[in-house]
C-alpha cells in the first residue's frame, strides 16, 4: 500500500468536507450581522476573497513545501483552516468572518501539498490513477460536507464551523503523528541536484506553458456548469430546488466514480493523450447537447457524459507533474492550485454575465461557448511537444 498517497487522499477528503460543511450555512451566518439585501454581496466577496488569497499565496506555499518539506507546510495549512473555522464559529461581528477567510486563504496549501505528496510517492505511469483518486476524494468530501452542514445548520449556523474546526484539528493530529513523506528516490544529474530546488518559476513553467494554458482553460470551462446549472435548469425546465439538488448530487457521485475508478483503469490501457482527448470530447458533446435539449428528463443521460469528461484532468495533471523534478513538485502544484482558484474568481463573473445577457434570446449560448473552447483545446493538444526535462506530451 502506498501509505503517503493514501494519507494524502484522507487529508483531501477531510479538507473538502470542511469546505463543504460551511457552504449551506455561510449565508445564514451573514444574516446575523447584515440586512437581507446585503447578504448576497458579502457572500460573494467572502468566496472571492478566499480564492484571491489562494491565487497569490498557493505557489509560494508550494515552493516552501519543496524547501522545508511537505509535512511542515501541511501542518501550517491545517492549523490556519482550524483557526479560520474556530474564528467563524465564535464570530459575533462581521470583520471576524473576513479575517478568518483571509487567514485561511493565505495558509491554504492543503490541495497543493497533497498533490505534491502523490507526485512524490508514485511513478509517472501511476499518477493519472492517483490524481483521479485525489479528485474523487475532494468530490466525495464536497458531497458529504454540505449534507452534514445542512443538518447541523438547522441546529445553529455556528455548529457546522465547529465541526469543520474539529475535522481540521483531527487532520492536523493525523499529519503530526502519522504522516511521513515519501523518500524521494528520483535520480538526478549532479548539476540538477545542486540547482533544482532553487529553480525559478519562469524556468520551471516555460516548457509547460501550453499545458498550463490547457489546464487553465479546462478549469475555466468547468466553471460553466458550476455557475449556470441552477439558473439554466430553472429557466429552461422550470426545475425546483429538489430537482436541481438531485441532479447535482447525481453528477457529483458519477464524477467521483469516473475519476476514482475509470481514469485509473483507462490509464493502464491507454496513453494520457488518448484519455485527455476522450474526456474533452465527452464534455464538449455534453455541452452541445445541453444547449439543445428541450425537456428536463433529457438532462440525466447527459450527466453521464459530463461525469465522463472528468477523466481528462487527472491525465492532464499527471502529464504536467512529469514536467517537474521531485524537488519542484510543490512549486508546480501550487501554481496549478493558483490557476484553479483564478478560474474560480473569473469564471462565475464571466459566465453569469453571459447567461444574463443571453437568457431571454438564447439561453444555451454559454454551453456553446464551452463547446467551442473544448474544440480549441483539442487543437492545441495536437500541437504540444514534449516539455523538458521529463514531461510527456499532451
UniProtKB/Swiss-Prot annotation:
InterPro entries on file: MFS, MFS_dom, MFS_trans_sf, Sugar_transporter_CS, Tet-R_TetA/multi-R_MdtG-like
Gene3D superfamilies to which the protein is assigned, alphabetical: MFS general substrate transporter like domains (1.20.1250.20)
Keyword Cell inner membrane: yes
A GO CC term assigned to this protein in UniProt: plasma membrane
CDD domains per UniProt: MFS_TetA
A Pfam family: MFS_1
PROSITE patterns, alphabetized: MFS (PS50850), SUGAR_TRANSPORT_1 (PS00216)
Entry keyword annotation includes Glycoprotein: no
Transmembrane portions of the chain: 6-26, 42-62, 73-93, 94-114, 135-155, 159-179, 198-218, 243-263, 274-294, 296-316, 335-355, 364-384
Record membrane topology: Multi-pass membrane protein
GO MF, one example: antiporter activity
Subcellular location: Cell inner membrane
Gene Ontology biological process terms from the UniProt entry: proton transmembrane transport; response to antibiotic
Range of residues in the leader sequence: none
Keywords of this entry: Antibiotic resistance, Antiport, Cell inner membrane, Cell membrane, Hydrogen ion transport, Ion transport, Membrane, Plasmid, Transmembrane, Transmembrane helix, Transport
Family annotation (SUPFAM superfamilies): MFS general substrate transporter (SSF103473)
Main localization (coarse): membrane
Chain's role: Resistance to tetracycline by an active tetracycline efflux. This is an energy-dependent process that decreases the accumulation of the antibiotic in whole cells. This protein functions as a metal-tetracycline/H(+) antiporter.
Family: Belongs to the major facilitator superfamily. TCR/Tet family.
Protein name: Tetracycline resistance protein, class D
Organism for this UniProt entry: Salmonella ordonez
Source lineage: Bacteria, Pseudomonadati, Pseudomonadota, Gammaproteobacteria, Enterobacterales
Amino acid at each position: 500500500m502506498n501509505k503517503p498517497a493514501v494519507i494524502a487522499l484522507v487529508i483531501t477528503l477531510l479538507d473538502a468536507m470542511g469546505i463543504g460543511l460551511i457552504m449551506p450555512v455561510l449565508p445564514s451566518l451573514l444574516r446575523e450581522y447584515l440586512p437581507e439585501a446585503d447578504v448576497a454581496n458579502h457572500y460573494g466577496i467572502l468566496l472571492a476573497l478566499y480564492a484571491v488569497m489562494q491565487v497569490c499565496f498557493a505557489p509560494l506555499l508550494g515552493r516552501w513545501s519543496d524547501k522545508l518539506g511537505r509535512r511542515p507546510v501541511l501542518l501550517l495549512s491545517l492549523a490556519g483552516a482550524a483557526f479560520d473555522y474556530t474564528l467563524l464559529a465564535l464570530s459575533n461581528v462581521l470583520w471576524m468572518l473576513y479575517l478568518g477567510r483571509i487567514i485561511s486563504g493565505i495558509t491554504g496549501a492543503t490541495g497543493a501539498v497533497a498533490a505534491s505528496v502523490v507526485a512524490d510517492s508514485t511513478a509517472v505511469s501511476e499518477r493519472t490513477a492517483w490524481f483521479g483518486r485525489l479528485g474523487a476524494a475532494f468530490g466525495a468530501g464536497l458531497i458529504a460536507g454540505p449534507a452534514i452542514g445542512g443538518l447541523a445548520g438547522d441546529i445553529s449556523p455556528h455548529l457546522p464551523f465547529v465541526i469543520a474546526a474539529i475535522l481540521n484539528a483531527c487532520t492536523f493530529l493525523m499529519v503530526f503523528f502519522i504522516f511521513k513523506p515519501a523518500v524521494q528516490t528520483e535520480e538526478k544529474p549532479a548539476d540538477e541536484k545542486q540547482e533544482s530546488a532553487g529553480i525559478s518559476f519562469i524556468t520551471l513553467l516555460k516548457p509547460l506553458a501550453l499545458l498550463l494554458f490547457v489546464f487553465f482553460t479546462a478549469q475555466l470551462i468547468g466553471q460553466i456548469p458550476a455557475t449556470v446549472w441552477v439558473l439554466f435548469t430553472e429557466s429552461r425546465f422550470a426545475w425546483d430546488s429538489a430537482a436541481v439538488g438531485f441532479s447535482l448530487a447525481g453528477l457529483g457521485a458519477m464524477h467521483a466514480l469516473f475519476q476514482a475508478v475509470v481514469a485509473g483503469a483507462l490509464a493502464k490501457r491507454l496513453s494520457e493523450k488518448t484519455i485527455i482527448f476522450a474526456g474533452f470530447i465527452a464534455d464538449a458533446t455534453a455541452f452541445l447537447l445541453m444547449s439543445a435539449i428541450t425537456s428536463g428528463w433529457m438532462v440525466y443521460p447527459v450527466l453521464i457524459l459530463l461525469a465522463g469528461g472528468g477523466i481528462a484532468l487527472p491525465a492532464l495533471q499527471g502529464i504536467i507533474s512529469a514536467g517537474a523534478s521531485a524537488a519542484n513538485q510543490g512549486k508546480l502544484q501550487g501554481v496549478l492550485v493558483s490557476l484553479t482558484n483564478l478560474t474560480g474568481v473569473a469564471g462565475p463573473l464571466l459566465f453569469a454575465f453571459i447567461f444574463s445577457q443571453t437568457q431571454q434570446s438564447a439561453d444555451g449560448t454559454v454551453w456553446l461557448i464551452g463547446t467551442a473552447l473544448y474544440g480549441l483545446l483539442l487543437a492545441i493538444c495536437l500541437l504540444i511537444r514534449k516539455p523538458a526535462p521529463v514531461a510527456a506530451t499532451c
